């Protein structure tokens, strides 16, 4: 008997998620370090790389969503997984060529710029493939295959996997990257890349098996006549959909610098608050730990209050804790700094809980034929918020002016509460399929 036949469909989906996320997190963690090995002291090179990846993904996101809706599931999974595979493989090749060129004294060569752009474009393709796979698994296969009464439990396990890989994969990747021969400083990068490549193979066969066993090869497809049609995006139609206000409420939370994982907050704590790196690192690690609490609190409140009410309570909790955090921040004393950081950690319970709720509401409410379009719109809005936030951060004349971003962050979270309450008050009883009530 095949091993795959012994695993439930839900288990196969979760295992596929674990494989892809662990590799993605490890690769993303070491890429900036590898760039700094090749270009020591040039932090702007790593920043420029990620800017290209973010902008490229931003531009291609709407088209990828429409493409998902116009193609069979098996084809979507195949393209998503193998696009990542060949993009990571290309990235390894370009890293090796860049390192060889720089070692040979070719810093002034035109080929250096060409290889760097090629590396960044491979990063865009890897990001796009990851996004296609995430939407296919989390926003299409999961709501189609997982029983409605099990969906909250399934999503909680998805979140646990995401948080576990967010913490564990970088630790393992950092250890691999640190140990290398002197003659081959990127040996760790290549090992991590190989780990990533190997993980794509079982992931693809797991997802293909899920689709074939479930009989979901055929889905309601949106008509698309050509590639030109795929790249013609009707954003006005997406924005006018009622689900947009749900998506917007979540995207507003990405306009916040009040995150343990935020680059801007970490820089402020180091430069202005003079906190040691060990405390900042502990703060970052605890952020994921507090996020795990939501994987217990959210399902519990769903059983007690229903999906929408649980989402409201978690989002409201985030607003209250960040309100206290910003009040402590405004006081400016040494003790209040730790109150500020403690409340940010508590707010992660609310943030991740609401994230679970918003994710499940999209799973239940978006019709099959528009899952790619509207879920890619969600990615588009969160990416836009990230770009806006970093653009605002780059315009700050002094580190101390970071306080304005803190106040804007609180305003964005409170506005998210208003938007979600207004949207959810019009929903009544949310159903999945024909008659599975979400509110109890």
From Swiss-Prot:
Coiled coil: none annotated. Residues 39-42, 104-109, 177-186, 272-276, 330-335, 396-398 are extracellular. Keywords: Cell membrane, Membrane, Metal-binding, Transmembrane, Transmembrane helix, Transport, Zinc. The keyword Ubl conjugation does not apply. Ca(2+) binds at residues 24, 84, 196, 203. GO terms for cellular component: plasma membrane. The chain crosses the membrane at residues 9-38, 43-69, 73-103, 110-145, 148-176, 187-213, 243-271, 277-304, 307-329, 336-365, 371-395, 399-424. It is a multi-pass membrane protein. Changing residue 261 to D: Complete loss of iron binding. Completely abolishes the transport ability. Residues 1-8, 70-72, 146-147, 214-242, 305-306, 366-370, 425-440 are cytoplasmic. Changing residue 348 to M: Complete loss of iron binding. Completely abolishes the transport ability. It comes from the Bacteria. GO terms for molecular function: iron ion transmembrane transporter activity; metal ion binding. Its cofactor is Ca(2+). Changing residue 196 to A: Reduces transport activity. Complete loss of calcium binding. PANTHER family: SOLUTE CARRIER FAMILY 40 MEMBER. This is Ferreportin. It comes from Bdellovibrio bacteriovorus (strain ATCC 15356 / DSM 50701 / NCIMB 9529 / HD100). The gene is slc39.
């Amino acid at each position: 008997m095949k091993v795959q036949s012994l695993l439930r469909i839900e288990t196969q989906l979760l295992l596929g998620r674990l494989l892809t996320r662990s590799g993605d997190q490890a690769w993303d963690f070491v890429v900036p370090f590898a760039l700094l090995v090749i270009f020591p002291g040039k932090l702007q090179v790593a920043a420029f790389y990620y800017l290209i990846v973010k902008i490229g993904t931003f531009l291609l996101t709407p088209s990828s969503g429409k493409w998902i809706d116009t193609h069979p599931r098996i084809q979507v999974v195949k393209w998503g997984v193998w696009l990542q595979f060949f993009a990571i493989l290309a990235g390894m090749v370009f890293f090796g060529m860049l390192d060889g060129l720089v070692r040979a004294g070719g810093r002034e060569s035109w080929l250096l710029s060409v290889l760097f752009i090629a590396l960044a474009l491979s990063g865009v393709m890897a990001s796009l493939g990851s996004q296609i796979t995430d939407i296919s698994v989390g926003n299409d296969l999961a709501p189609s295959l997982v029983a409605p009464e099990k969906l909250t439990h399934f999503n909680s396990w998805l979140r646990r996997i995401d948080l576990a890989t967010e913490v564990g994969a970088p630790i393992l990747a950092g250890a691999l990257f640190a140990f290398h021969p002197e003659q081959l400083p990127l040996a760790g990068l290549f090992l991590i890349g190989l780990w990533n490549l190997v993980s794509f193979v079982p992931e693809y066969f797991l997802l293909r098996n899920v689709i074939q066993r479930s009989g979901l090869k055929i889905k309601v497809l949106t008509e698309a006549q050509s590639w030109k049609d795929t790249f013609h995006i009707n954003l006005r139609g997406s924005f006018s959909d009622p689900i947009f206000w749900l998506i917007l409420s979540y995207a507003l939370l990405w306009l916040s610098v009040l995150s343990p994982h935020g680059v801007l907050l970490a820089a402020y704590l180091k430069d202005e608050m003079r906190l040691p790196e060990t405390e900042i690192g502990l703060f970052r690690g605890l952020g994921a730990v507090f996020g795990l609490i939501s994987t217990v609190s959210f399902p519990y409140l769903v059983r007690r209050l229903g999906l929408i009410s649980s989402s409201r309570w978690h989002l409201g909790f985030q607003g209250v804790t960040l309100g206290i955090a910003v009040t402590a921040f405004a006081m400016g004393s040494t003790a209040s700094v730790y109150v500020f950081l403690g409340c940010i950690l508590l707010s992660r319970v609310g943030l991740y809980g609401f994230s679970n709720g918003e994710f499940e509401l999209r799973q239940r409410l978006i019709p099959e034929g528009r899952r790619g379009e509207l879920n890619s719109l969600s990615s588009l809005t969160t990416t836009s918020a990230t770009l806006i936030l970093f653009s605002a951060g780059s315009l700050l004349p002094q580190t101390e002016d970071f306080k304005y971003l803190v106040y804007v962050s609180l305003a964005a979270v409170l506005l998210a509460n208003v938007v979600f309450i207004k949207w959810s008050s019009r929903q009544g009883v949310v159903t999945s399929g024909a008659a599975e009530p979400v509110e109890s």
